[in-house]
Regions:
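DNA-dependent DNA polymerase catalytic subunits
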Residues: 1-13, 21-203
Length: 203
């Protein structure tokens, strides 16, 4: 029976992410997939074969479909991730163990709040730890316990670490005058509301 399973995990602008486990287990049935060093070695070996095959096929593709003899089409293996969390398009995090053939141990994040400059420092540290724990396979109960402890500690944190470092523009547009105070109109962004409330304390 023809195998029609889709092994592609995620597609980005100019890259694709595939699970190497099915082909590794097919080629090496008795391999210990928990052996990180051995798995990395075998993945690089197979990726090199696939890379060479695809790059050779681009000559035919360029000639037959693009009607050109010379081209710059090239595919290259870059990263090996031990685990990943894909939230939605262009929002994911991965635990990288090999980067262009070099052994590493780092977190690769794209599009998530923890890499945004406007995200509060304390929450950034908290979510980074949560993401690292998820990728490391830490039990959910322990992660939930960490989050609850963080929530309890919020009252003790400096406001500089829990506030949003963002500008407040066009504040007047969201103000409606009340009895000696400034009221925020319906639909006012939260950081603009904060600025309006702060100004009320100065009145």
């Amino acid at each position: 029976v023809e195998d029609k399973e889709d092994y592609c995990i995620y597609i980005d602008t100019d890259s694709v992410f595939y699970s190497a486990i099915p082909i590794i287990q097919k080629k090496y049935p008795h391999i210990d997939i928990k052996d990180e060093t051995l798995m990395t070695s075998k993945i690089l070996e197979i990726a090199s074969e696939v890379q060479e095959y695809l790059n050779d096929s681009y000559d035919l593709f360029a000639k037959k479909f693009c009607n050109i003899d010379e081209h710059r089409f090239e595919i290259k293996q870059e990263l090996i991730a031990k685990s990943g969390l894909f939230v939605t398009k262009k929002r994911y995090g991965m635990k990288i163990i090999n980067d262009n053939g070099v052994k590493v141990n780092k977190l690769h994040v794209k599009g998530l709040d923890i890499v945004r400059s406007s995200f509060p420092v304390a929450f950034k540290e908290c979510l980074t730890k949560v993401l690292e724990d998820i990728l490391a396979g830490v039990p959910m109960l322990k992660i939930n316990e960490f989050i609850l402890n963080f929530k309890k500690s919020m009252k003790l944190k400096n406001y500089d670490t829990i506030s949003m470092p963002t500008s407040a523009k066009n504040v007047k547009k969201f103000i409606s005058m009340g009895e000696g105070i400034l009221n925020a109109k319906k639909g006012t962004p939260v950081h603009i509301k904060s600025a309006i409330n702060y100004n009320n304390f100065l009145l």
